[in-house]
Swiss-Prot record:
It comes from Mycobacterium sp. (strain KMS). This is Sulfate adenylyltransferase subunit 2. It catalyses: sulfate + ATP + H(+) = adenosine 5'-phosphosulfate + diphosphate. NCBIfam families: CysD, PRK05253.1, PRK12563.1. Its EC number is 2.7.7.4. The gene is cysD.
Length: 309
């Protein structure tokens, strides 16, 4: 079999880089949703992926303002740096922020806080907020390289009237043809970063000069080991009597609820350092630092079936 010959670009021919192709794809998806749906929302935690999502969404509609709100499902167990970054970005860009509070659901008796982690309770709060605000599409920052359940999910991911996902009943998705059809009460989760990797995210952050919470970069803080993970000492995450606290240089690869988010030992204090570190990593960020994904082999898929991000 003869290999197909790919002609070199003609002099002066415009050619997009890998990062710009990913950016163009994501912006196309965001604009498609804005045109097709009545009440979209962007899920925004203040973490690196949702910050990149917000950056892309603002680019998609500039110089106009973002035509939909952003929503944070707030467990109440947050890193202070992440919340301050969230509030600053929302204020700087004139974006409407909807905060869906897990604490409100606990106080109202809709969920029971059995501790220590509130991460499993987010699903109820997320689905309530989608229902109350009548959102018919929700942008998420999930990527296929993060975890195997996310690897098989469509860019336009259908959710039934209960917010549930059925991985065996996913719609065909050919090239850039997306199916957003749904009935009243149903909605679509949309993942414009599906084809990005952690490396791509950091390369884009560097190329665009995007500001992140300081905890993504190396810093010294007290930590302790638990179940093979480094956890930060925090008012919501305290060591047990047999767990030794020590100080070391760490950074966070992913950020979520304090009680289930681990850090990694690192001296990478710049975007360039992190890109170099990511290039040689053999563990996904969630596999290395998220306790909520270690519940079982199918932990993420089980939660997504129930309506998780």
């Amino acid at each position: 079999m003869t290999a197909a010959h790919v002609a070199a670009p003609e002099p002066g021919q415009y050619e997009l880089s890998h990062l710009r192709l990913l950016e163009a794809e994501a912006i196309h998806i965001i604009r498609e949703v804005a045109a097709e749906f009545e009440r979209p929302v962007l899920l925004f935690s203040g973490g690196k992926d949702s910050i990149v999502m917000l950056h892309l969404a603002i680019k998609a509609f500039a110089p106009a303002r973002l035509p939909f709100p952003v929503m944070h499902v707030d467990t109440g167990h947050n890193f202070d740096e992440v919340i301050s970054t969230r509030d600053r970005l929302v204020a700087e860009n004139g974006v409407r922020l909807v905060v869906a509070s897990v604490q409100e659901d606990i106080d109202a008796g809709r969920v029971v806080d059995n501790g220590p982690s509130r991460n499993p309770l987010q699903t109820i709060t997320l689905l309530r907020a989608i229902r109350e605000n009548r959102f018919d599409a929700a942008f998420g920052g999930a990527r296929r390289d993060e975890e195997k359940a996310r690897a098989k999910e469509r860019v336009f991911s259908f959710r039934d009237e209960f917010g549930q996902w059925d991985p065996k009943a996913q719609r065909p998705e050919l090239w850039n043809i997306y199916n957003g059809r749904h009935r009243k009460g149903e909605h679509i989760r949309v993942f414009p970063l599906s084809n990005w990797t952690e490396y791509d995210i950091w390369a884009y952050i560097g190329a665009e000069g995007i500001t992140l919470p300081g905890i993504y970069y190396a810093h010294t803080r007290p930590v302790f080991q638990r179940d093979g993970m480094l956890l930060a000492v925090h008012p919501y995450m305290q060591p047990r009597d047999d767990e030794e606290v020590f100080e070391t240089s760490v950074r966070f690869r992913t950020v979520g609820d304090v009680t289930c988010t681990g850090c990694v030992e690192s001296t990478a204090s710049t975007v360039e350092d992190i890109i170099a570190e990511t290039a040689v990593s053999r563990l996904t960020e969630r596999g290395a630092t998220r306790a909520d994904d270690r519940i079982s082999e199918a932990g993420m898929e089980d939660r997504k079936r129930e309506g998780y991000f």
